[in-house]
């Protein structure tokens, strides 16, 4: 028995009365909220309207879930369509089985539809949500822990994952927690994108491409450690080949885009009132209110000064009038004396 290890949950579902709350789905939901929340902050900082990220996510998230499931079912079709299998299980997404490659690809289609409806460029939106997607994946990977799936080779390290379920044909034991490795890697990718965006002012989809490239590096390494059944090409797992191909495409996009359109977009959302301060700068939500207060105070001071000047002029005129009356009386008396 290992002295130290990561225990697996006794079950992957909790019941709130008759309603099942599955750990896998719960992790995905948390990830979506984190991605939308962070993406919204970055979008507003770039000059967009609050709420735009969420509006487009309404399109991107369902498309992404469908794409992720399709990729999994197509690449592991024997789990659902081979002899003795029930094809209906292909629709049971809550039992696990989402391919990130399909989720990103079809999710991008949904995001493109949402962006066209709002009249904004897809690359700018993708840059805003890129680190949030990485953090969302970090949360989502814990769903594999709840389902006791997608772990690595057998090991005796202190952080080994104790697998108690044998539903996938594996012998219960201690294995590399690849879900944890990928979760930590995704956290690092998220912070890398934020730092690089702040340092190099990434725009026109380059922040998103950096996220894709960085994720592929970690995924290729972690995929090599996994021992679950997978298709192989030339002795290499299919997902490794996919990671290599997507990595090269992402790097190529960064290079070509930097030459063709350096810098960031000047306007990310036409008609937005706030031009933004940059994705790396904090958004001063009270700036407009402070400006309005200052303008009001200035107008009040100007009005007060004008009133005082008017009153001062009026008093001077009255004083001049009062001084003129005695003078006129004195002159009249002098003329009378001369006549006498």
Curated annotation (Swiss-Prot):
InterPro entries linked? Lgt
Residue ranges under compositional bias (Basic and acidic residues)?
A: 284-294, 326-340
Q: Record's Pfam families?
A: LGT
| Associated pathway | Protein modification; lipoprotein biosynthesis (diacylglyceryl transfer)
The UniProt entry's coiled-coil ranges are none
- The EC number on file is 2.5.1.145
Presence of keyword Acyltransferase: no
The membrane topology of this protein is: Multi-pass membrane protein
For this UniProt record, the keywords arranged alphabetically read as follows: Cell membrane, Membrane, Transferase, Transmembrane, Transmembrane helix
Annotated region (Disordered), positions in chain: 266-340
Q: Where does a 1,2-diacyl-sn-glycero-3-phospho-(1'-sn-glycerol) bind?
A: 141
Q: What does this protein do?
A: Catalyzes the transfer of the diacylglyceryl group from phosphatidylglycerol to the sulfhydryl group of the N-terminal cysteine of a prolipoprotein, the first step in the formation of mature lipoproteins.
Q: What is this protein called?
A: Phosphatidylglycerol--prolipoprotein diacylglyceryl transferase
The protein's organism comes out as Streptomyces avermitilis (strain ATCC 31267 / DSM 46492 / JCM 5070 / NBRC 14893 / NCIMB 12804 / NRRL 8165 / MA-4680)
In the UniProt record, what gene is named as encoding this protein? lgt
């Amino acid at each position: 028995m290992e002295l130290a290890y990561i225990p697996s949950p006794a079950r992957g579902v909790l019941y709130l009365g008759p309603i099942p709350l599955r750990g896998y789905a719960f992790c995905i939901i948390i990830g979506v909220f984190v991605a939308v929340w962070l993406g919204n902050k970055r979008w507003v900082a770039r000059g967009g309207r609050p709420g735009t990220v969420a509006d487009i996510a309404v399109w991107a998230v369902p498309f992404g879930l469908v794409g992720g499931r399709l990729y999994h079912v197509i690449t592991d079709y024997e789990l659902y369509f081979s002899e003795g299998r029930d094809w209906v299980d292909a629709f049971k997404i809550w039992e696990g089985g989402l391919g990130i490659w399909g989720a990103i690809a079809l999710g991008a289609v949904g995001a493109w539809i949402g962006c066209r409806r709002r009249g904004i460029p897809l690359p700018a939106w993708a840059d805003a949500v890129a680190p949030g997607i990485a953090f969302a994946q970090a949360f989502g990977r814990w769903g594999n822990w709840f389902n006791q799936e997608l772990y690595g080779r057998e090991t005796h390290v202190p952080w080994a994952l104790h697998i108690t379920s044998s539903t996938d044909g594996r012998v219960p034991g201690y294995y590399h927690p690849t879900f944890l490795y990928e979760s930590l890697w995704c956290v690092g990718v998220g912070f890398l994108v934020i730092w690089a965006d702040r340092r190099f002012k990434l725009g026109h989809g380059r922040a998103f491409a950096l996220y894709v490239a960085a994720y592929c590096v970690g995924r290729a390494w972690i995929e090599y450690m996994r021992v679950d059944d997978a298709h192989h090409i030339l002795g290499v797992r299919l997902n490794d080949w996919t990671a290599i191909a997507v990595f090269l495409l992402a790097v190529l996009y960064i290079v070509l885009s930097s030459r063709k359109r350096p810098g960031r977009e000047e306007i990310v959302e036409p008609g937005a009132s706030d031009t933004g301060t940059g994705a790396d700068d904090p958004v001063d939500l009270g700036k407009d209110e402070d400006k309005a207060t200052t303008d009001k105070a200035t107008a009040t001071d100007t009005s007060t000064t004008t009133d005082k000047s008017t009153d001062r002029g009026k008093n001077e005129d009255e004083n001049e009038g009062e001084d003129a009356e005695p003078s006129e009386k004195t002159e009249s008396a002098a003329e009378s004396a001369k006549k006498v």
